[in-house]
């Protein structure tokens, strides 16, 4: 008998040793190599200014009407509301990952009955056996068992912790995504508002030009009646008047479209927007804000968002790598068990419990685990390249817009000189035409050139403001 027991123990030890060796073999995990981020390392170092250069949008935009519109957009915009729900989802995912690290405890209530065959080991053994003093085991035996069940996957290798960290990074990325969208919304509202003011100014210029052409038609008719000019001159001025009148309605349509686009950003149905067109041309474009240190690029929400996504991908690789390691699961139960409810509280006789632990390690056919690891590694590289792309794009946009801001300032100064000269030329041409010393073509050309120059001045002012807004798109502080 002792030899038999010894042989059984020997077999058990051999099996345990084999399982131990197999588990050790299964502990070999692949290593992911992430290349050095040369793009971030080679980012030009800032030589001036500090983070305090980020403008608060309320200070940046002095127009009270625009401030009110931005406030409305930040409160009502549907895209922002969608991102809030995405953040809530990401936050819930953190709680779910955190919950996976803790043991789960469930309450169970089991009620049943069983009957075993008479000619079985259990059936034969139960014959004459008393379940309580003076009472044999009934043929049909009830079973009532309230209990608590515990299941726990012990995080031996911090795999679950890595999964939670990935969820945290994704939540932070969603926060920065919302900051990016908010800053984008501020910029979009401002650009649409200034575009609307620019169209108002263009319409005002066009209406003045139409009045000028109406007067020119009258003068041409007087000149023709006095035989100082021909019918051709009258028709040319009338054609120019018709052309200007058509452009008026084109501008009115553009105003309607821009106003509706702005209302869409505000999260409301088309509503007239009260505004003062003078707020565009009177707006001073601050040149001191046209230089942004490159260090601020690393603090842009879109760049920080891409960085959090990269960190999340790194943790995902760690989770996939640790899937090659053995996992330890513990299950336990504690409860009461009796054939009759009145015996449930007869402690400790009615007490029932059990504990079991299991160590599981992948040994054969790891293709699925390897595929998950390869996928996580590829996604990590993709996140790195996306981060580099966002950073390169931010820097490229910044340098382009800084040059654009400088060149537009020079362009506008020259356009102002051109407008002054053309204004004098129009007056001179009109006077000369009245005295029959200039042709109608010279008058038309000078008036059309003046119109084009005035429109270009409005466009230049708008482009300067849009350029400055684009420079700080993604950098606006949302305080205040």
Language-model features and meaning:
Residues 66-68, 89, 143-145, 191, ...:
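Transmembrane beta-barrel architecture of outer-membrane proteins
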Residues 27-41, 74-155, 257-273, 292-371, ...:
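A small-residue-enriched
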Residues 227-230, 394, 401, 436-440:
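Alpha-helical heptad-repeat coiled-coil segments that mediate oligomerization/polymerization in large
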Residues 2-75, 252-295, 341, 473-480:
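Terminal intrinsically disordered/low-complexity segments used for targeting and assembly
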Residues 82, 98, 154-182, 232, ...:
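Sec/SRP-type N-terminal targeting helices
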Residues 217, 243-271, 417-477:
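Short segments within alpha-helical structural elements
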Residues 3, 28, 178-292, 404, ...:
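Periplasmic alpha-helical coiled-coil/stalk elements that build and connect Gram-negative outer-membrane
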């Amino acid at each position: 008998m002792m030899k038999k027991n010894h042989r059984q123990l020997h077999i058990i030890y051999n099996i345990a040793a084999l399982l131990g060796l197999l588990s050790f073999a299964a502990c070999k995990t692949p290593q992911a190599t992430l290349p050095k981020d040369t793009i971030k390392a080679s980012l030009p170092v800032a030589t001036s200014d500090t983070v305090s250069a980020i403008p608060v949008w309320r200070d940046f935009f002095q127009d009270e009407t625009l401030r009110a519109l931005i406030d409305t957009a930040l409160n009502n915009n549907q895209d922002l509301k969608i991102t809030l729900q995405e953040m809530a989802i990401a936050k819930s995912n953190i709680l779910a990952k955190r919950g996976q690290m803790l043991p789960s405890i469930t309450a169970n209530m089991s009620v049943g009955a069983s009957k075993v065959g008479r000619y079985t080991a259990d059936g034969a053994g139960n014959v004459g056996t008393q379940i309580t003093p003076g009472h044999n085991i009934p043929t049909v035996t009830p079973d009532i068992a309230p209990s608590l069940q515990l299941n726990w996957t012990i995080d031996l290798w911090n795999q679950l912790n890595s999964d939670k960290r990935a969820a945290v990074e994704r939540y932070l990325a969603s926060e920065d995504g919302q900051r990016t969208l908010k800053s984008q919304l501020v910029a979009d509202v401002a650009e649409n508002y200034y575009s609307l003011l620019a169209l108002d100014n263009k319409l005002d210029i066009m209406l003045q030009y139409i009045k000028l052409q109406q007067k020119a038609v009258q003068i041409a008719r007087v000149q023709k009646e006095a035989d100082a000019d021909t019918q051709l001159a009258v028709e040319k001025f009338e054609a120019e008047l018709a052309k200007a009148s058509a452009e008026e309605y084109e501008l009115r349509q553009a105003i309607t479209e821009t106003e509706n686009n702005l209302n869409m950003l505000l999260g409301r149905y088309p509503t007239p927007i009260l505004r003062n067109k003078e707020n565009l041309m009177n707006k001073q474009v601050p040149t001191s804000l046209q230089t942004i240190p490159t260090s601020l690029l690393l603090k842009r929400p879109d760049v920080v968002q891409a960085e959090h996504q990269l960190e999340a991908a790194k943790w995902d690789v760690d989770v996939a790598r640790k899937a090659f390691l053995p996992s330890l699961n513990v299950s336990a139960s504690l409860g009461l068990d009796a054939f009759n409810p009145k015996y449930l509280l007869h402690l400790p006789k009615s007490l029932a419990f059990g504990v079991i632990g299991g160590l599981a390690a992948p040994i054969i056919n790891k293709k699925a685990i390897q595929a998950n690891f390869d996928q996580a590694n590829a996604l990590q590289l993709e996140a790195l390249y996306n981060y580099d792309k966002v950073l390169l794009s931010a820097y490229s946009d910044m340098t382009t817009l800084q040059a654009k801001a400088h060149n537009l300032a020079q362009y506008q100064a020259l356009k102002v000189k051109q407008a002054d000269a053309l204004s004098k030329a129009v007056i001179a041409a009109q006077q000369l035409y009245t005295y029959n010393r200039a042709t109608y073509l010279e008058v038309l050309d000078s008036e059309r050139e003046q119109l084009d120059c005035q429109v270009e001045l409005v466009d230049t002012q708008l482009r300067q403001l849009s350029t400055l807004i684009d420079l700080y798109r993604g950098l606006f502080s949302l305080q205040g």
